Amino acid sequence: MKVGIVGAMAQEVEILASLIENKNVVHIAGCTIYQGNIQDKEVALLQSGIGKVAAAMGTTLLLQMFKPDIVINTGSAGGVSSGLKVGDVVVSTQTVYHDADVTAFGYAKGQLPACPPAFISDPKLTALVENVAEQQGINLTSGLICSGDSFINSAEKLAWIKANFPEVVAIEMEATAIAQVCHKFNIPFVVIRAISDVGDGEASISFEEFLPLAARQSSSMVLKILQSL
C-alpha cells in the first residue's frame, strides 16, 4: 500500500520526514514532497503550505505524481468540542468549509456547488484510528472538522462557527480542501490532528507555545496507523 500524508507546515511534517528511509525529495510549486519508506510502507509526505489553495494544489500534485492508495492529513487544529485539551487527538468523520456560503442558491452552509454537503472520511480509516487510539489509551474525539482561510483567534468567531456547525469538534485551515481533492480523485482520506489551541482570544499564544506538542502527538498517531495498515 502506498500512503500519502499531508501536513501544512514544516513543524507538522518534520518528525515523519526524519523517519523516511530511501528518501527522495521533490520541490515543486512551493511544495515539498518526501518519498520513501516508513517501516514497510511506501509513503509520500507532502508539506503543502498553509491554507486551502496551497493544500488543494499540493494534494493534487501528490495524487498525480505518486498515486497513493489513501491520504492522511496530519498536523494541528483548534479544539472546539467541550473537554478537548491541548495535545488531545481528533479524527474526522467528515469535513466542511466554515467560510463557504452559497445558501442563496439552496446549498447547505459550507457546501460548494458540484460538491456534497460534507466530505465523508473513509469509514474504515476512521474506525482504524479509533481502534488504535482505544488500544493505546489515547484521548481521541471523532467528528466534524471545519476548515477556512482564517486562524480563529476570537471568541466571537468561534461562537459563530459553533452556532452554524454545531457538530464541529475542531477547526483548521486545510483539511476540507484536501478532502475535496480526494473526493474528486476517489481516494480514501482521513484527517488526524492534535489540538494546539482552543480558538479563543488566546489562541495565537497557545498555538505558538503548543504547536511542537501537537506535531508530536499527531505524528505519533500517524505512525501507529502506518503500523496497523
From Swiss-Prot:
Keyword RNA-binding: no
Annotated binding of substrate, by residue: 78, 152, 173-174
Top EC class of this enzyme: hydrolase
CDD domains: MTAN (cd09008)
Enzyme Commission identifier(s): 3.2.2.9
Gene: mtnN
Name of the molecule in the record: 5'-methylthioadenosine/S-adenosylhomocysteine nucleosidase
Source taxon at top rank: Bacteria
